Amino acid sequence: MFLKHLTIQNFRNHEELSLDFDSRLIFFVGDNGEGKTNLLEAICILSWLKSFRESEDSNLIRWGSENYFLRGKIKDNLKESVLEIGFTSKPSVKRKLKFNQEEIKKRTDLIGKFITVLLTPMDLKIIEGGPAERRKFIDAFISSFDPFYLESLLEYNKILKHRNALLKSGNPDISHLSIWDKKIVEKGIFILNKRREVVLELNSFYRVNLDKLSGGKDGLELIYKPNVKDQDEFLEKLNHNLSRDLRLGYTSVGIHRDDLFIGSDQRDITEFGSQGQKRSTVIALKAATFNYYKNILNTIPVLLIDDVIRELDVKRREYFVDLVVTAGQAFFTTTDLEGIQDYVGKLKDQKQIFLIRQGKVESIK
C-alpha cells in the first residue's frame, strides 16, 4: 500500500495542509511540540479510524474550530481510492466517513482499505502494562483485517454488559441469565479460536524476528493464555462462579480475562525483562504483524514510525533498516536528520523530507 496524498484541516495544531507523497521514505523533521507526530496521527486515523494517543475525537480539533477533516489518497497495487473522515463537535457531535465519495455507515466496511503498522515509544505498554493492554493489542490487530471478528468483539462486550447488569441487580431471573450465558459463550468461543489461530502464526514470525535482533539468545515466544479453553469449560465456569459473580456484581470468567504471555519457561519478560529485551520484543512483535499482513494476507502495509530511531542500538537499527527496505512505504518522525542516514543510504533516491515548524510544513531537499 502507498499513501499518495494527505489533506488536513483543523486537526491538532495544523490549520490546513495538502501534502503529496511520491517516495517510499517520508521524514517529518521538527523539534518536540511542533506537530510532526500529529501528521503521523492523522495518517493513523485514516487507517484505524481512531487515534493512537487520544480517545476523544473532540480533543483532536484545532483550538477555536468546530470540526476537523482528513483525506487520504491511497494506492494499492494499481488501484487508487480516496478515504475521507470528518468530525464535527457543534451543534451536535457527528462523524462522517466516505470511501470514493460514497458515505460509509458501518466502520467495518472500511476494514482493510488502508492498512498501517505503527511503532511508537508508547508500545512498551504492551509489555509493561497488564493483560488488558495485551488483549487490546491482539484485538486491534485482528480487527484491522477481519470485520466479523470486530463485530463479534463488539457484540461480546454488549452481552457482557447486559450480564453484568443482571448480576448487579442482586436477584436476577436465572432463566434470563442462562440466555445471556449461551450468547456470551457462543461469541466468546469464536473470539477465543481466532485469537489462538492468529497468535500461533504471529509467534512463528516473532521468534524469527527476535532471533535476528538478539542473535538467538533470548528464546522467547508468544503464548495465548485463555481464561477458558473451550465451550464446555466456559459454561461450566459460568455456572460454578455464579454465586461469586453475584457477590462481585460482574462476570469473573471469560475471554475478557485472557492474556498474551511473552517469555519462556524460565521467565516472563513482562516481569523480568531488561529494557533492551523489552525494546527488542516490541520491535519483533510489531514486525511480526507486518510479516502477517505480507505473508498471510498478501498485502504490504504502510509503516508509521514515531520517533524511535534514536533509541535503537546498532544491531536493532540494522534489523529495522532491512524491515523498512521490504516495506512499500514508511513514514518517520524525528527531531534531527542525523538519525535517518542509515535509512536514506539504501533508498537515497526514494525519500522526501518535510520540515515542521509552528504548524507549518515545508518540503526540503
From Swiss-Prot:
One GO cellular component term, please give it.
cytoplasm
PROSITE patterns, alphabetized: RECF_1, RECF_2
Positions that bind ATP: G30, D31, N32, G33, E34, G35, K36, T37
The record's keywords, sorted A to Z, are:
ATP-binding, Cytoplasm, DNA damage, DNA repair, DNA replication, DNA-binding, Nucleotide-binding, SOS response
Q: Name one GO biological process term.
A: double-strand break repair
Where is this protein localized, as stated in its record? Cytoplasm
**InterPro entries to which the protein is assigned, alphabetical:** DNA-binding_RecF (IPR001238), DNA-binding_RecF_CS (IPR018078), P-loop_NTPase (IPR027417), RecF/RecN/SMC_N (IPR003395), RecF_2 (IPR042174)
Q: What GO molecular function terms would the record report?
A: ATP binding; single-stranded DNA binding
Give one Pfam family. Answer: SMC_N
Keyword rRNA processing listed: no
Per its UniProt record, what Gene3D superfamilies does this chain match? P-loop containing nucleotide triphosphate hydrolases, RecF/RecN/SMC, N-terminal domain
Q: What does this protein do?
A: The RecF protein is involved in DNA metabolism; it is required for DNA replication and normal SOS inducibility. RecF binds preferentially to single-stranded, linear DNA. It also seems to bind ATP.
Q: Give the family from UniProt.
A: Belongs to the RecF family.
Q: Which NCBIfam families match?
A: recf (TIGR00611)
What PANTHER family does UniProt report for this protein, alphabetically? DNA REPLICATION AND REPAIR PROTEIN RECF
**HAMAP family listed in its UniProt record:** RecF
Protein's name according to its UniProt entry: DNA replication and repair protein RecF
Q: Which organism is it from?
A: Leptospira interrogans serogroup Icterohaemorrhagiae serovar Lai (strain 56601)
Upper taxonomic classification of the species? Bacteria, Pseudomonadati, Spirochaetota, Spirochaetia, Leptospirales
